[in-house]
Amino acid sequence: MHTPFIVALDFPSKQEVERFLRPFAGTPLFVKVGMELYYQEGPAIVAFLKEQGHAVFLDLKLHDIPNTVKQAMKGLARVGADLVNVHAAGGRRMMEAAIEGLDAGTPSGRMRPRCIAVTQLTSTDERMLHEELWISRPLAETVAHYAALAKESGLDGVVCSANEAAFIKERCGASFLAVTPGIRFADDAAHDQVRVVTPRKARALGSDYIVVGRSLTRAADPLGAYARLQHEWNGGERESTTPT
């Protein structure tokens, strides 16, 4: 998992994935397969992407009783994803069970997929946290607590807003991964996410990986948008024209 850019393949079919990836032929990407695509195409979509040379984040956000999550992770470990995730709200025992399942299911000679925990969705704000979820603690405090719990449970990192990456690193250590969705170019619409930042700011705030979806997948020129992503991540202010 070398590139810090995770491209969210939020498509309903393999055909649309192939169409989007065509301009990137020969360029290994780090891609995210979420519920929409995985539930339509199943494990075969991960196998296809791996055959094309891409790293895969299988974003299914497991949240169930510990034994169910353990058995599910045993199966997912054989699918071939490089990164998987759970909801930290499932608690310590569930997260520990996820690691147990991955350890048990990873084929001999293959590295165990890294496992990260979702702290709070980037569509969650303070009002929703308090009024709908009935969590009385401030959002930042809740995220920090979930991150610490994930680390104590043996996970490799968390999914969090870039705005939360710095204090998570401070609390959990520099090697604890901060994978941040809610990334938009400055001239993009935020859509249904409320805690959004630009690629440049995400790096400055301490993100290890950034998840980028509609800014790339709905771009008129995805290759050019990817080049812009690289350029902005590296501190540039003007759009580049070709990816490196």
UniProtKB/Swiss-Prot annotation:
Entry's SMART domains?
OMPdecase
Any Pfam family: OMPdecase
Q: Coiled-coil stretches, from where to where?
A: none
Write down the chemical reaction(s) this protein catalyses: orotidine 5'-phosphate + H(+) = UMP + CO2
UniProt record, GO biological process: 'de novo' pyrimidine nucleobase biosynthetic process; 'de novo' UMP biosynthetic process
In short, the EC number is 4.1.1.23
| Highest rank taxon of the organism | Bacteria
Which residues of this protein are catalytic?
Answer: K61
Keyword annotations for this protein, in alphabetical order, are: Decarboxylase, Lyase, Pyrimidine biosynthesis
Which Gene3D superfamilies does the UniProt entry name for this protein? Aldolase class I
An annotated GO cellular component? cytosol
Gene Ontology MF term list: orotidine-5'-phosphate decarboxylase activity
Pathway this chain belongs to: Pyrimidine metabolism; UMP biosynthesis via de novo pathway; UMP from orotate: step 2/2
Entry binding sites for substrate = 10, 32, 59-68, 122, 184, 193, 213-214
Its biological purpose: Catalyzes the decarboxylation of orotidine 5'-monophosphate (OMP) to uridine 5'-monophosphate (UMP).
Subunit and interaction comment: Homodimer.
Q: What protein does this entry describe?
A: Orotidine 5'-phosphate decarboxylase
Tell me which species this is from: Bacillus caldolyticus
Write the gene name.
pyrF
